[in-house]
Design a protein with these regions (language model features):
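Residue-level marker for buried hydrophobic side chains located in beta-strands
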Residues: 6, 32-34, 61-62, 211, ...
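Active-site glycine-centered loops adjacent to acidic/histidine catalytic or metal-binding residues
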Residues: 9, 36-37, 64-65, 241-242, ...
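Active-site neighborhood of divalent metal-dependent phosphoester/pyrophosphate hydrolases
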Residues: 29-43, 61-72, 106-107
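Metal-dependent catalytic neighborhoods of phosphoester/phosphodiester hydrolases
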Residues: 41-54, 72-80, 249-252
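Short, glycine/acidic-enriched loop or turn micro-motifs at the edges of active sites
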Residues: 11-12, 40, 68, 217, ...
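Active-site phosphate-binding/coordination module
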Residues: 68, 75-106
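N-terminal active-site segment of His-dependent metallophosphoesterases
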Residues: 1-51, 55
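Acidic, His/Gly-enriched loop-helix segments that form or flank divalent-metal centers
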Residues: 97-261, 265-269, 278-279
């Protein structure tokens, strides 16, 4: 009989995910339920989403705030990947971005990048290596001082997705530079819309209901169900993530038989539990 494993926020930590799954006893064919926030912050986002999609039949995904944000921005990603050279320069921008870097934010500042046709060709055919060189190449290729519509997308992503709170620059770089198959895996993840996974048991287990969500459905991690004494609310195991801790946080409600588990141990590790260990 296959087992069910629940993984906390992964944040692109493929190595941490595999180490925790293997330590918990996961085997091929077992079910993996992810509480959300699979990408961003870590360095192996494409590898992580590819692994999950390869096991699509055995994976259940809860939408986290990071997935929701990428889903909203997917229309802009699609614009950037249409032209190979634009995709290349855009990928370079997000690969080399560091907090505190400056870049043009107004039409007047873009005018400072205007150059002759010969200089434009020289910039485009060059081999940029730094953030500012990629910015200049993107602006030159798209003639952003005349039409800044594409640059506005870059600017928006830099302002919204890079640095706190999403730290998604590595993910955007990987999405723009990876294979079509890997991009399809990213989009498969971001288009998941389930906000909750429910499992009910009729066997005489300690818990009759399992509720898996991205964050504590009642507030912060020490919040609890005020209706916990009502039938159907008691004897419930709540599993969630979103707020990171150095280890899995558990608190029990003796009066109702409910237990709350925050399994987000990012960024240093990926919290994984085998559900049968708690039943």
């Amino acid at each position: 009989m296959s087992e069910i494993f629940v993984a906390g926020d992964i944040h692109g930590n493929y190595q941490g995910l595999m180490e925790s799954l293997n330590a918990a006893g996961w085997q091929e064919g077992d079910t993996i339920i992810c509480v959300g926030d699979v990408t961003d912050r870590g360095k192996d986002n494409a590898r992580t989403v590819s692994f999950l999609q390869e096991h699509e039949c055995d994976v259940r995904l809860v939408q986290g705030n990071h997935e929701l944000q990428h889903k909203k921005l997917l229309q802009y990603y699609h614009v950037l990947i249409k032209v190979p050279q634009i995709r290349l320069f855009a990928a370079g921008i997000f690969r080399t971005y560091k907090a505190g870097y400056t870049y043009p934010k107004t039409k007047e500042e873009l005018k400072e990048y205007e150059c002759s046709a010969d200089r434009r060709i020289e910039i485009i055919q060059g081999k940029p290596k730094t953030f500012h060189a990629f910015v200049r190449a993107f602006i030159a290729y798209t003639l952003a001082w005349e039409d800044d519509s594409l640059w506005k997308i870059i600017l928006y992503l830099l302002e919204v997705m890079c640095g706190n709170p999403y730290d998604a620059e590595r993910t955007i770089y990987e999405y723009l530079s990876c294979t079509r198959k890997q991009r399809a895996a990213f989009e498969w993840l971001w288009n998941q819309t389930a906000t909750e996974v429910n499992i009910d048991y009729t066997e005489p287990y300690k818990y009759q209901h399992i509720v898996i969500t991205h964050n504590n459905p009642f507030g912060r991690y020490y919040s609890y169900d005020l209706d916990e004494l009502r039938p159907g609310h008691d004897k419930t195991l709540y599993i969630f993530g979103h707020i990171p801790h150095s280890e899995i946080v558990r608190f029990d409600r003796a009066c109702s038989g409910c237990t709350y588990l925050d399994i987000d141990t990012s960024p240093n590790s990926v919290g994984v539990i085998k559900l049968s260990d708690y039943l």
